[in-house]
């Protein structure tokens, strides 16, 4: 397969690209390699350098809404487009709503136009569990979506755009929609919840928990990447939507306490929940298990320990945090 991957330099993206390359697929990456100002430049440079180690695919550092995308489609001739590129999460979109809409809507529209123009067969859209809004455990893909906040709204709008474009091709272009949740792991940015918890614990600082009883379906990045690749190469996923998560909810308080336990330092402070974020639980993954054998292997305890060990062996973080004695 010739697979064009947008956002292929990101946390999930680079893990997906490595798996696709190892399976013998031809991959081309489009990624602006920006962090939208959420982490220091030296950290971004470090992350990009480490993520790209071993990747052979060509990287095009352009915006997906650029007219230059037409030339990439003409030259590479993808039969599959995987759209991972996005603003990273709700907080960033809320702070930059117009820029968020441009990236998440205009960029997607350009990709869909290019895909229909150039005869792409399959479009993989990486959405988010944020489309559901408030939900409890065992939410299925056919649940009514009531997103709260611009990130979830734009992701759900993207799902409908993808469905509409594929509907109008009368079967020549199919789609697969993926809804991941709370993905974490090595080479993530420091501004996500598990990264914040782990770094605060390693520094011996206070882990600030916004809503002790709030739960998330934390998913280790290897499991998320395996699920996305499985859905991409399967013949049974056309025009379907899948939850790709660990399918187990953890409270934020339990996650913070686990980080403190593993690091051997730090303390926990509970605060009021953030009203801008929906209350979430675990997602049901029966459809992914049935259609392409998705089987997430890394539970939160093992995942946190793997993530912690990565910090301890990362030259960048050892130097930045003075972790030589840890």
Which residues make up each language-model segment?
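Residues in well-ordered alpha-helical elements
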Residues: 67, 79, 91, 98, ...
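Generic recognition of short, well-ordered alpha-helical segments
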Residues: 15, 71, 95, 188-192, ...
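C-terminal substrate-binding subdomain of Rossmann-fold SDR/epimerase-dehydratase oxidoreductases
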Residues: 201, 205-326
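Short-chain dehydrogenase/reductase
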Residues: 93, 181-182, 241-244
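NAD(P)-dependent short-chain dehydrogenase/reductase
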Residues: 137, 148-150, 160-216, 221-230, ...
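Flexible, glycine-rich phosphate/dinucleotide-binding loops
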Residues: 36, 90, 132, 184, ...
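N-terminal Rossmann-like NAD(P)+-binding domain of SDR-like oxidoreductases, especially those catalyzing
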Residues: 1-179
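Short, histidine-centered active-site or binding-site loop motifs used for metal coordination
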Residues: 88, 143, 181-182, 211-213, ...
């Amino acid at each position: 397969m010739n697979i064009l991957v947008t956002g292929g330099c990101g946390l999930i993206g680079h893990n997906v690209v490595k798996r696709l390359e190892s399976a013998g697929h031809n991959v081309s990456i489009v990624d602006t390699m920006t962090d939208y100002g959420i982490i220091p430049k030296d950290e971004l440079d470090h992350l990009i350098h480490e993520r790209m180690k071993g990747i052979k695919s060509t990287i095009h550092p352009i915006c997906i809404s650029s007219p230059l995308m037409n030339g990439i489609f003409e030259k590479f001739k993808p039969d599959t487009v995987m759209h991972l590129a996005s603003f990273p999460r709700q907080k960033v979109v809320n702070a930059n709503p117009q820029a968020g809409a441009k990236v998440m809507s205009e960029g997607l529209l350009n990709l869909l136009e290019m895909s229909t123009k150039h005869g792409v067969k399959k479009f993989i859209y990486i959405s988010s569990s944020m489309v559901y809004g408030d939900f409890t455990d065992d939410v299925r893909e056919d649940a009514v979506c009531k997103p709260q906040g611009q990130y979830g709204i734009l992701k759900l709008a993207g799902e409908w755009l993808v469905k509409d474009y594929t509907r109008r091709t009368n079967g020549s272009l199919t789609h697969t929609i993926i809804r991941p949740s709370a993905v974490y792991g090595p080479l993530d940015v420091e501004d996500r919840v598990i990264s914040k918890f782990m770094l605060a614990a390693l520094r011996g600082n206070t882990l600030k928990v916004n809503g002790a009883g709030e739960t998330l379906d934390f998913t280790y990045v290897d499991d998320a990447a395996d699920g996305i690749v499985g859905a991409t190469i399967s013949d049974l996923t056309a025009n379907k939507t899948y939850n790709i998560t660990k399918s187990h909810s953890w409270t934020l308080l339990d996650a913070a306490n686990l980080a403190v336990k593993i690091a051997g330092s730090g303390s926990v402070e509970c605060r009021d929940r953030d009203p801008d974020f929906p209350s979430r639980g675990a997602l049901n993954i029966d459809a992914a298990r049935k259609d392409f054998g998705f089987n997430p292997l890394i539970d939160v305890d093992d995942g946190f320990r793997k993530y912690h060990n990565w910090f301890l062996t990362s030259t960048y973080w050892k130097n930045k945090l003075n972790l030589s004695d840890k």
